Regions:
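Conserved nucleotide-binding/hydrolysis micro-motifs of P-loop NTPases
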Residues: 12-17, 39-42
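Amphipathic alpha-helical segments of the small helical/lid subdomains adjacent to P-loop NTPase cores
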Residues: 34-91
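Conserved nucleotide-sensing/catalytic segment adjacent to the nucleotide-binding pocket
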Residues: 1
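Accessory nucleic acid-recognition modules appended to NTPase machines
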Residues: 98, 102-186
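Short regulatory helix/loop adjacent to the ATP-binding pocket of P-loop NTPases
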Residues: 16-31
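Hydrophobic/aromatic beta-strand patches that form the interior of the parallel beta-sheet core
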Residues: 8, 32-34
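Structural recognition of the conserved hydrophobic beta-strand(s) that form the central parallel beta-sheet
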Residues: 6-12
């Protein structure tokens, strides 16, 4: 590059991190790495045209344990339900905001999941590929249980952490999932 243009590259860093293969080199030059994450609920609200003063009012009510005005409460419940279905992936959110077509939203979500699975096949070591994919595909069942602790027996009957823990770690390292550790509500 001769410096006349800024170039932005995106994508999986699994190949660069060296999963399953010798680490590949990163092009030399001015490089800034920015870790990107899905939109959180507040960002989802912004994308849906909810302005900052409204969000601040909601935060103030919640922080001070005050009643949220009825109209705001109704709208936030609706948006929270939509967020739980749409999620925070930018392309999915943009499609939802611009079209409100759930069939298009679901197709983009399926495409994202397929690309995650393709990365597993491309970058994981051969001996780990099936276990990683099994762990990944068990996530919906894991999340639908009342007990939210990851249970290896749901991945495969009789399975243990010693067999699958590395697979789950691979999925987290890939940025596909992130662990949430809950603590008891403090009163």
């Amino acid at each position: 590059m001769d410096g006349r243009y800024d170039v932005i590259g995106t994508g999986s860093l699994l190949g660069v991190k060296g999963y399953g293969k010798e680490p590949k080199s990163v092009p030399v030059g001015s490089e800034t790495v920015i870790d990107m994450y899905p939109l959180d609920f507040e960002e989802f609200l912004w994308a849906n045209g909810i302005e900052t003063p409204v969000i601040e009012l909601l935060k103030t009510c919640l922080q001070n344990e005050k009643t949220v005005p009825e109209a705001l409460h109704k709208r936030m419940k609706q948006l929270l339900l939509q967020y739980t279905v749409v999620g925070g992936m930018p392309d999915v959110v943009q499609t939802f905001v611009s079209t409100k077509q759930m069939d298009e939203v679901l197709q983009i979500q399926r495409d994202i999941v397929r690309s995650y699975e393709d990365d597993m096949i491309k970058y994981a070591e051969k001996k780990d590929k099936s276990r990683i994919k099994e762990c990944f595909q068990s996530i919906p069942k894991q999340l639908s249980k009342e007990n939210k602790k990851f249970q290896y027996s749901i991945v495969k009957k009789g399975s243990t952490a010693s067999k699958y823990a590395g697979s789950l770690q691979w999925i987290e390292d890939a940025g596909t999932v992130s662990y949430t550790h809950l603590r008891a509500h403090e009163t």
